[in-house]
Swiss-Prot record:
Protein's UniProt name: Proline--tRNA ligase
SUPFAM superfamilies hit by this protein: Class II aaRS ABD-related, Class II aaRS and biotin synthetases
Family matches, as InterPro entries: aa-tRNA-synt_IIb, aa-tRNA-synth_II, aa-tRNA-synth_II/BPL/LPL, Anticodon-bd, Anticodon-bd_dom_sf, Pro-tRNA-ligase_IIa, Pro-tRNA-synth_IIa_bac-type, Pro-tRNA_synthetase
Gene that encodes the chain: proS
Reaction(s) this enzyme catalyzes, per UniProt: tRNA(Pro) + L-proline + ATP = L-prolyl-tRNA(Pro) + AMP + diphosphate
Coarse class of the protein's main subcellular location: cytoplasm
Family classification: Belongs to the class-II aminoacyl-tRNA synthetase family. ProS type 2 subfamily.
């Protein structure tokens, strides 16, 4: 992609309304643009990040056999009345009447609708288990939206819902999804810790939140130091991981700490995922019954699994940035390589840039080629800001000898590389 043809509205000054670094950097780098309080347009750079996160989440859901559906963002209120949750959300839930005086709402979550879908289509234990998920925009009318897309009013979520014949099977499914979440965050290039948490308005009696460690996190979490080995050992048994101590602040129990010889540490965290074993709360309230193997009608056992996709974009930045800008993990980066031509009027620079762009693109490595007239200092500032994992810098002196500079955005290390060997240094 040629930068001269791209839509990248960079802000030179820090936006005054931004309180956290991710909000500042998302606005400055042209990822998002504010439309109203808590509402943002996702511009091309930001949308690429959002799609990359979405695709990684989708891939991991598919691997555990979850089936994708797409429920409407507008829901009939009668389902929420039936489940008993309609009044609970209060003004946070946006409600309105259609032309036929039906009460509708902009869904903040989907337990009620998915239960309705299940009860209308599945009647026998033979059709279980089922695990359905969707990725959809949601709306919650926050009293005080803040921190950009971290706590906006409109947000993109992945919601999954599992249905099982009994508690034992439901917990087995829960454990599979627990592990799928660990794998998902690993694939996203972030370190997320699963902590015991409250279920809140969803209900149920087993719950884990997944927190990305970041100094700007709103929550304090306490966890066993062994969690750090998950980065390099993703195949550790789920039951072993769940035996390690990890708790959100409201669940922290100092009396249990002596049982964990490895030591407990605490950090600020940003919640990016939440999973719940719900049990039969919704199936009882909404009459979602199935025939068991003896022909008896019983309520189905449910669990709910959420990941905040738009929130993740901001949380990843909070955990991966410096004074110059964003440092994207390779898997979610909008462009993997920034190709910086320092002199677009030098024939050799143009030749090497074109060759590099073609070779990397042929390897399905997304490249943003800076072919603009901007000065070198301005170009470096722009590409440090947008955070491509690698920068390939082409200047006249070194280009004359078929040499380019390769910069690792995370480490800042610069290397002179012969153009023929460049592809070997891009670690995918």
């Amino acid at each position: 992609m040629l930068l001269s043809k791209y839509f990248l509205p960079i802000l030179k000054e820090e936006p005054s309304e931004a309180q956290v670094i991710s909000h500042k950097l998302m606005l400055r780098s042209g990822m998002i643009m504010k439309q109203a309080s808590g509402l943002y347009t996702w511009l091309p750079l930001g949308l690429k990040v959002l799609k990359n996160i979405e695709n990684i989440v989708r891939s991991n859901m598919n691997k555990v056999g979850a089936l994708e559906v797409l429920m409407p963002c507008i829901q009939p209120a009668h389902l929420w009345i039936e489940s008993g949750r309609f009044e609970y959300y209060g003004k946070e839930m946006l409600k309105f009447q259609d032309r036929h005086d039906n009460t509708l709402l902009f869904g903040p979550t989907n337990e009620d609708m998915i239960t309705d879908i299940f009860r209308r289509n599945i009647k026998s234990y033979k059709d279980l288990p089922k695990n359905l998920y969707h990725i959809q925009w949601k709306f919650r009318d926050e009293i005080r939206p803040r921190f950009g897309v971290m706590r906006g009013r409109e947000f993109l979520m992945k919601d999954a819902y599992s249905f099982d014949i009994n508690q034992e099977n439901a917990v087995n499914t829960y454990n599979k999804m627990y592990k799928a979440y660990i794998n998902t965050f690993r694939d996203l290039g972030v370190f997320a810790i699963p902590v015991i948490a409250d279920n809140g308005p969803i209900g149920g009696n087993l719950s884990h939140e997944f927190h990305i460690i970041a100094e700007t996190g709103e929550s304090t979490i306490y966890y066993d130091k062994r969690f750090k080995i998950l980065k390099d050992n993703p195949d550790i048994d789920v039951e072993e991981i769940k035996s390690w101590y990890a708790a959100a602040e409201e669940k922290h129990d100092v009396n249990k700490l002596s049982s964990f010889p490895e030591g407990i540490t605490s950090s600020k965290g940003i919640e990016v995922g939440h999973i719940f074993y719900i049990g039969s709360k919704y199936s009882v309230n909404m009459n979602a019954l199935i025939n068991d193997e003896y022909g008896k009608l019983i309520p189905v056992e449910m669990s709910s699994y959420g990941i905040g996709i738009s929130r993740l974009a901001a949380a990843i930045i909070e955990a991966n940035c410096d004074k110059k800008g964003i440092i994207w993990p390779f898997s979610v980066a909008p462009f993997k390589v920034s190709l910086i031509n320092l002199n677009i009027h030098d024939n050799k620079c143009v030749e090497l840039a074109a060759k590099t762009d073609k070779e990397l693109s042929n390897k399905n490595i997304e490249v943003l080629y800076d072919d603009t007239e901007a000065r070198p200092g301005s170009k470096f500032a722009t590409h440090d800001l947008i955070g491509s994992p690698y920068q390939v810098i082409i200047g006249p002196k070194k280009a004359a000898n078929n040499i380019v500079e390769l910069k690792d955005r995370k480490t800042g290390v610069l290397e002179d590389i012969e153009i023929e060997n460049l592809i070997n240094y891009i670690r995918i």
